[in-house]
Structures are given as structure tokens and as C-alpha cells.
Amino acid sequence: MRLRETAPWLALLALATGCFLAWRWLSRAMFERNPQYAIRRVEISPGFAVSEAEIRDVTGLREGVNLFSFSAAEVRNRLLLTKRNLADAEIAKTLPDTVTIVAHDRIPAAKLCSSRLALDANGFVFAILPRDAERYRAVPLIENGASPYRPDAGRTLSDSPGTPTGVEARVMRALRVALLCDRPERAFRLSNLDVSNPTYLVLLTGDNRVIRLVWEELVDDTAILQGLSMADDTLRDPASRAHKRFDVVLSAGKVFGG
């Protein structure tokens, strides 16, 4: 009796399995094994960080590969995991025979204790390739005094609200300062940011003037912008040329020259 009750379900399952296998065979015959969909053009926009040859090597996409034999998302993920100097990549298939790859370079927002190590705007650590050293020569350098801080490439540094404590948090807060300072209307350009002092973030400008900001006051972007604006207004004043060091104290609403 039980066999008689289950027999229709078993037949239905067998039919569904057969339909699925037939669909898979037909799909491969029509698409994955169809020479009509063999790649004839691979169009690559490589940027600067990765060459066209490197992209071809990592992705494995070349003339003759079938468009339906690979997942564009999986190939993209492999490319980004292999080439950390890329921030993003777009891989698109265009029927019947074209693949387009657009690579987007990871742009350094600051160097980190070395001309060869950098942070992007999100705190991702990556190496600056020798061929890119001159291109990023003007990117400001975050330093930690006599104790260089060199986290492994591939990490993303973290920050927390409030007063930054610890080297990593101070580095991330200095990164925010560098990003918020990078505006064409500023009266000064940052060259170095030293996070080694537990009380002050020490900024060195391109014309060798020193600006000190109090860590306890750099609690968020609003406070950072206020401090930079105060420094900006002070350095625009012709009277500031008599000074080389400027202490920005938000709580007092003043900049003290020395």
C-alpha cells in the first residue's frame, strides 16, 4: 500500500530530474559549447596600477573562451583579491563574442611610515608599486616618530568615535585630517602628519610650517574642519609669516603662534 502511494511521487521526481538533466545538456549544447559564443574581443581599460597583461593572466579571459563558461562576478572577485592595488573592477559580457574589463585603481590618500606603503580613503593598507612612486610623490606621509607603524598590506584599519587612543586610531584620525585638508581653497598643503605625540597631532606643511592640533579635540569631522579652518585663516594673515609653529586650540577658539 505504501509503495502504491509513493509511486506517483517517485515518478514525478524522476521526471523532474530528467527534465533538469535534459535542460543542462541543452544549455551546454546551445551556449557553453556553442562556438558562436567564443570570445573574439577582450576590451581592457587597465588604469595605472595593473597592466593589461596582468589582467589577462589573472582573469584567464582571452580569445576562444566561451562567454557562458565563466561567472563574471567570480572572475571580478578573483581579480580584486589578487591585485590589491585595484579598488574595483567591472566585467561585462556583450553577446555574442565580447568581454569588457574596466579596472579602477586604488588611490592613496596618505602614505604610512614609508614611501612604499599607503592608505586609501577607507583605511585599506596597500603597497605603492615602484612604477607609481613618482605619480604619488605629493601624497602626504603619516609618521609615528621613531617607531614606524607598518601594518600588513590587505588590512583595513579601524577607528572609533571620540578621542583616538592607540597608534591605529590616531593614524585613522590623521587620515581624516589629510582627506579634509585636501581642498584647493586651503592656504597650505600637508606634507607630513606625525601621530607619535600623545597630546598633539603634528602637521608639517609644504612650506615647513608646523601646525599642532589637540587629539582630545579631534572627536569628529566637524571638529577637524573647524581646526583646519582656524589654521587656514591664521596662515593667510601676513602677520603669521613671523611664526613657524601654530597651536590650534578649539576650546579657546584661538591659534597660538610660536
Each language-model region and where it sits:
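Charged, solvent-exposed interaction patches on well-folded alpha/beta domains
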Residues: 1-41, 57-58, 64-78, 87-258
